[in-house]
Amino acid sequence: MPLSHGQKPTACLALADGTIFYGKGFGATGETQAELCFNTAMTGYQEIMTDPSYAGQIVTFTFPHVGNVGVNPEDDETADPVADGMVVKWDPTEPSNWRSAGELSDWLASRGRIAIGGVDTRRLTRAIRQQGAPHAALAHDPEGNFDIAAMVARARAFPGLVGKDLARDVTCAQSYRWDEMRWAWPQGYARQENARHKVVAIDYGAKRNILRCLASAGCDVTVLPASATAEEILAHDPAGVFLSNGPGDPAATGAYAVPMIREVLEKRADLPVFGICLGHQMLALALGATTVKMNHGHHGANHPVKDIETGKVEITSMNHGFAVDSQTLPAGVMETHVSLFDGSNCGIRMTDRPVFSVQYHPEASPGPQDSFYLFERFVASMDAA
């Protein structure tokens, strides 16, 4: 909750333009610098903080109640939080949920992540929207000692995400097989037994629930690092290739990912390829399009997207700060989905091959499940190959 009169702040958020927000710190102590974004999801704070796509960002939650259902080991999208920090309106209360295994503050502290509560998140969200994902410094000091001028200077010195290949920081170190399926009551996460197609997933920062959706759809998934070569991928003789989500500037990651994708497409003309988020941007770059940095990005679980081919609207989960420039799509590549918020590109496909991708997250986690059909479409394309 907001600081009471005379209460000394124990956390401070300093924006690069000199705007200062004080509040109550929780989680780890110390300071971090990152790009600020806001997320409009009402649930799923644990999944959001552990989504590798948030590397290099401090997440502002527009929903005021964060932490009230605690944390648990099943909802992590990767082993540890990846987002650099958390900003909330109300500091977390004692959790109340049958799945809770601990408190948010303790979970953040044990993983070295700083958080601030008691912030006017409506005011901050407007600032993010108007300034365009500003850089910021977030500090937590139980004694409340902050060098504001130095924090602002460090926020201004943060290099930003443009030109940053963050996929290398969050990808797996070596290949592994994935057979865990989506969570279901009462058994939890079951193991896959009857796979239909061998799929190679390129890990640019893959969320666990994307891999679970692939396994649940009947894919025998082998995950390879972001640096995998076309030769290494094709050595697995896959029925399909999946390009995962991830953080950072797609143009930077594309320095090594784009040549690999092009070589795979050249050597296996019949190979189905499916991309999500950064994987969507990697595919677009490989096909000849370009990407651009967005003003404040799309982060939330309530983003309407129109399927141009069917006219249907899907409510989707999104997390990206870069977008494909649809005006640069070459012949033979069509735009399939657009955002109803700003008209930005949300999907493409090749017109003569089973190759397609979307900017949003069909696996949700958190978010709506309107777009699960895309995993089925990927499997159907392998059935037909």
Name the predicted role of every residue range.
Residues 25-26, 64, 319, 350, ...:
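Residue-level structural signal for beta-strand termini and adjacent loop
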Residues 198-202, 316-317, 356-360:
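Active-site-proximal beta-strand elements of phosphoester/diester hydrolases
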Residues 114, 198, 270-274, 290, ...:
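Proline-centered loop/turn at the N-terminus of a beta-strand
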Residues 239-326, 367-385:
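Cysteine-nucleophile active-site neighborhood
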Residues 191-195, 267, 349:
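Short, flexible hinge/linker loops that cap or flank conserved catalytic cores
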Residues 1-236, 365-367, 377-385:
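RNA-binding accessory domains that recognize and position tRNA/RNA substrates
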Residues 311-353:
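Catalytic beta-strand/loop cores that center a nucleophilic Ser/Cys/Thr
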